[in-house]
Amino acid sequence: MSETHLSTQRFADLPLHPEVKQALAENGFEFCTPIQALSLPVLLQSKDIAGQAQTGTGKTMAFLVATFNHLLSTPVPEGRLINQPRAIIMAPTRELAIQIAKDAILLAKHTHLKVGIVYGGESYDVQRKVLDQGVDILIGTTGRIIDYVRQGIIGLNSIQAVVLDEADRMFDLGFIKDIRFLFRRMPEANQRLNMLFSATLSMKVQELAYDHMNEPVKVEIAPEEKTSKNIKEEIFYPSQEEKMRLLLTLIEEDWPEKAIVFSNTKHSCETLWSWLEGDGHRVGLLTGDVPQKKRIRILEQFTSGQLDILVATDVAARGLHISDVSHVYNYDLPDDCEDYVHRIGRTGRAGNKGMSISFACEEYALNLPAIESYINHSIPVSNYDSEALLADIPTPAKIHRKHPSGTRNLRDRSGASRPGAQRSGARPPRHDRTRRHS
């Protein structure tokens, strides 16, 4: 994490439980991010908060530290049953729930608190076995949590801490009725520590907070600009016929260490995957139709570096916590201005530098004025020579073909026949076909 992203507040100087401090120190957490520095002193006084913070600001660790500290510092409710968690963390997506659980496990090492996770797309029985053994902190999506509550598999009578993450996204996805259903089955708001985080504290989000929380303190880390200064943006105006060749050419020029390519439709994403796979890249596909187990595997491969490129619809634009994404390519300009911000926000995180490259083709160019108005600046335009684009591109792969476990191709574009060579780990010589780097 870049030092520019951190505050001067040390975790060691906060009145945290010794086991929480030990877990933080062992995992390299020394200084707080701004949202952590503002929210933790409030939460450690057992006061509720409604926090405004973007993804990548450290809010996950803020509410996890507060949750663990609260449970370790508060007596277990009298008469608590094994099927009653003490804390519940609600997330809008499976991917976000999984990432939160991974971070929670880091803190759980020395605390003896059990962490459980539930979400749709996985076997009920497998998740139920974990719940039957008892969990202290339950993390999950609202739909699956409600299923288990209605079946009597879990009870909410012993809840002492509640986290609602990405509350604005919960509204977007229509989950607010589910959230209110769960809140009504918990102890009264003044008997638990309540935490809400949202990218925006709109009136509807604030209404939710005041309905189900105990006079929450508003904590805001609002960026001065909607897009990070760490992200270099550029936009091209390709024809629909040249978009794919331009993308493949730019990827060769940039040779990104880790990139996400966004498109607006599942069909377009599948087409992109086919061309990138056919061109020898290590690429994964993430859309709403991908089975959950495969989604998890793809994200793990992308995170670990087994895949270099992830092609995704906006299902992946929020809730993904993947470090070191160097490039984001908007193959299609999104219809929703906020989606543009969320997409490019996958890079340039935690003080790191990032690149955002967008295409304004005939179909989606009309979205650009609204996007630029929303982000309060014009996106610099880059030009290219059509004749300089790659021409000898391999045949696209079949979408149903099993992904090879081999390595990403490292091609010598200077040869007429474009012979392939396997990636050795070293960056290839840059081919500046579009003259962007001249």
Swiss-Prot record:
Q: Which reaction does it catalyse?
A: ATP + H2O = ADP + phosphate + H(+)
Q: Does the keyword ATP-binding apply?
A: yes
Pfam families per UniProt: DEAD, Helicase_C
Enumerate the UniProt keywords alphabetically.
Answer: ATP-binding, Cytoplasm, Helicase, Hydrolase, Nucleotide-binding, RNA-binding
- Name the residue ranges with Basic residues bias: 428-438
Recorded GO CC terms: cytosol
Q: Annotated motif Q motif: location in the chain?
A: 9-37
Q: Which residues form the Helicase ATP-binding domain?
A: 40-219
Segments carrying the region annotation (Disordered) are: 395-438
**Record GO terms (molecular function):** ATP binding; ATP hydrolysis activity; RNA binding; RNA helicase activity
Q: Which GO terms describe its biological process?
A: RNA catabolic process
Q: Which EC number(s) are documented for this chain?
A: 3.6.4.13
- Enumerate the residues binding ATP: 53-60
Q: Which CDD domains match?
A: DEADc, SF2_C_DEAD
Give the motif span (DEAD box): 165-168
What does the subunit comment say? Component of the RNA degradosome, which is a multiprotein complex involved in RNA processing and mRNA degradation.
Briefly state the protein's biological role. DEAD-box RNA helicase involved in RNA degradation. Has RNA-dependent ATPase activity and unwinds double-stranded RNA.
- Which HAMAP family does the UniProt entry name for this protein? DEAD_helicase_RhlB
**Family in the record:** Belongs to the DEAD box helicase family. RhlB subfamily.
- Report the protein name in the record: ATP-dependent RNA helicase RhlB
What are the leading ranks of the lineage?
Bacteria, Pseudomonadati, Pseudomonadota, Gammaproteobacteria, Alteromonadales
- The UniProt gene name for this protein comes to rhlB
